[in-house]
Amino acid sequence: MNMKRIAFLFLCLFGLLSIGHCQEKQSFDHYYLTIKAIKEGNISDFEKNIKHIKNIDSLFHTDTDHSYTMLGYACLYQNKHIVQRLIRMKANMECVYSDDMYCYDALYMAVDKGNAELVKLFLSLGANANVAYNEDGLCPLVMSCSMNSYPVTCLLLQYGAKANGLDNLGGDYITYPLMVAVDKNNINMVKILLKYGAKTKVRDKSGKSPIFVARRHKNVEIIKLLEKSR
């Protein structure tokens, strides 16, 4: 009798574990299918699967070391329609992507992709144009300058990004947008940064100034522009 009871309990436990495994697999399938729909721009499949995801803000990874929320995947694949749909679903914009060290917001991903439409959307919804992504001064404006994206740089400045960056945040380096723009030899970006008040006399922790970088590149136009703005 005891052996029968033990066997019965074992079968019940096995059944519960099997159900749990099936539910977990089904949950994974809905995540995978939703991500696939986002990537392919399949709105019908997106709507069909997203309703089965309990927490759209949970970070989920497939075959990479990085993890994304549903909004993060929508930004990754630059699907504006689904981005807007997820925002209507109250998706969190402050943590949509994570690597081994940091968690990044939706604005980070939009700037990283150089997608001016998404950048404008997130800024209009209150995203912080001066958010710090690390202790070395990485911020949206530094990113846009690094990517040579003039339209995104203009948008960030229009929405209050500090033309001088975030200054010293206690890291090993200080990153100034103007230094980056000069290093990229992008005269239009240099002009817009100066227009919004970027200082020409800043120096990084190695002592280099914007004009030093311009001279190293032998960019006469930028050298003249910086000298005139002193």
Predicted regions and their residues:
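Bacterial N-terminal signal peptides
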Residues: L9-L16
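Ankyrin-repeat boundary/"N-cap" motif
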Residues: S27-K36, L59-G72, V96-L107, A132-L141, ...
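N-terminal leader/linker segments that initiate helical-solenoid repeat arrays
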Residues: C22-K51, S58
